[in-house]
Amino acid sequence: MEIRAEEISEIIRKQIKEYGKEVEVAETGTIISVGDGIARIHGLDKAMAGELLEFPGGVSGMVLNLEEDNVGAAILGEDNENIKEGTTVKRTGRIVEVPVGEALIGRVVNAIGQPIDGKGPINTSTFGKVEVKAPGIVKRKSVHQPMQTGLKAIDAMVPVGRGQRELIIGDRQTGKTAVAIDTIINQKGGDLICIYVAIGQKRSTVAQVVSKLQEHGAMDYTIIVSASASEPAPLQFIAPYTGVTMGEYFRDNGKHALIIYDDLSKQAVAYRQLSLLLRRPPGREAYPGDVFYLHSRLLERAAKLSDDCGAGSLTALPIIETQAGDVSAYIPTNVISITDGQIYLESDLFYSGVRPAINVGLSVSRVGGSAQVKAMKQVAGTLRLNLAQYREMAAFAQFGSDLDKATQMQLARGERLVEILKQPQYRPIPNEKQVLIIFAANNGYVDDYPVASLRRYESELYSFFDGRKADILAELRDKKAIDDDLKGKIVAALDEFKKEFTA
């Protein structure tokens, strides 16, 4: 084969013409030490707090500590063999962002918004910053719309409003997650988008939650963010912020969202681990000094926005696990003081068969009263007081046998009220039916029946109204209040049902 000089020179000329000189300028640093999800990096002098860093192997990181001669960063992903001492880390100049938008609904994502459900990539071009300031005072409006949980005990006595932060607190195995999942299932057919953030949970538990939600058709309006127990502490720390960023997208677009953090005790533990590894000084129970701010800045992002800002809302139900019922520990007291009330679940009640195991005396909703449906407020006004008096009397009645008639009647009524408020899991009840059963219990319609037959009384009452008195249910649903005319109809219908029901 003959080599022709003019051809070679032509090719070289062409290549020189097409040669484009691109210089990429990036600020880089070198890893000094790495381990337990924390890297110390030298040379990133201009890095910002909370900035996204690029580690080798496509792993991201987040700047947490800015020190004189190095930067402490959390690695948002599994430590891999590419991340070691001496490797190069790049600045991005961006704060950590996660995907947001409608495309996430029905998906299961990890702590940085990447899909983990095997359904392919998430098609969204919208991203939200993980750390943003909560809405100011002017942008907010007081809570005034109800957020129905479908649980009689909560909707009647500890009502939750849209934009509220209501803590669910209790020991392990008292049904905290069950309350949250029932609330999600109850939103079916409504306008609420739900986000469930699982922090430090077993993967099998998260899979169980997903399958239950699919079974009840609730994944059609739910996003699940999972940072399981086997994932590094930085991911467990950032997962709640990822979830709230996704919820804020709906809130800021005039929609309504509900976010559940299950649970924030595990996030605090992950943050404690990060802080100690970053050599921040420990405080009470070895938590860092800013652990209060960790939760307050997260929960303050749940809000009811004013009409000028689109009137959207983000409701938060954080969960905290107590140890042996100790509500006065550090993290529980912090979160109680941040939230607008708490639902306290008690293991003694749970094991005695009262489920949901809500302790009415210690549970409170500080702002939900103004959001409660008027009809429920009318029938449940005395319920809380009656139950509290019953509990007190029942405690005294253990010591004395000679009780007068009035006390015996009050104890019998209280026993029936407790029974009426019990509810099986995954069976939320619409508000109008809750109003009916509580109205019946308060007005003595169940006093003559044995406690054991009340579960059957309740289900047959619902069937009776569904089949023959659907107009009353519709009127309750539309009016949301009981006037004299409607009260007369309900009383007549309950009298009619009483003749038919046999215990």
Curated annotation (Swiss-Prot):
- Keyword Cell inner membrane among record annotations: yes
Q: Which reaction does it catalyse?
A: ATP + H2O + 4 H(+)(in) = ADP + phosphate + 5 H(+)(out)
Q: GO molecular function, one example?
A: ADP binding
**Membrane topology annotation:** Peripheral membrane protein
Q: What class of enzyme is it?
A: translocase
The EC code for this enzyme is: 7.1.2.2
Binding positions for ATP?
G170, D171, R172, Q173, T174, G175, K176, T177
Indicate yes or no for the key word Translocase. yes
Q: Which Pfam families match?
A: ATP-synt_ab, ATP-synt_ab_C, ATP-synt_ab_N
Record-marked site positions (Required for activity): S363
Record's GO cellular component terms: plasma membrane; proton-transporting ATP synthase complex
In which compartments does the protein localize? Cell inner membrane
Q: Which UniProt keywords apply?
A: ATP synthesis, ATP-binding, Cell inner membrane, Cell membrane, CF(1), Hydrogen ion transport, Ion transport, Membrane, Nucleotide-binding, Translocase, Transport
Q: How does it assemble?
A: F-type ATPases have 2 components, CF(1) - the catalytic core - and CF(0) - the membrane proton channel. CF(1) has five subunits: alpha(3), beta(3), gamma(1), delta(1), epsilon(1). CF(0) has three main subunits: a(1), b(2) and c(9-12). The alpha and beta chains form an alternating ring which encloses part of the gamma chain. CF(1) is attached to CF(0) by a central stalk formed by the gamma and epsilon chains, while a peripheral stalk is formed by the delta and b chains.
**Function, as annotated:** Produces ATP from ADP in the presence of a proton gradient across the membrane. The alpha chain is a regulatory subunit.
The family line of this record is: Belongs to the ATPase alpha/beta chains family.
Name of protein: ATP synthase subunit alpha
Q: Which organism is it from?
A: Geobacter metallireducens (strain ATCC 53774 / DSM 7210 / GS-15)
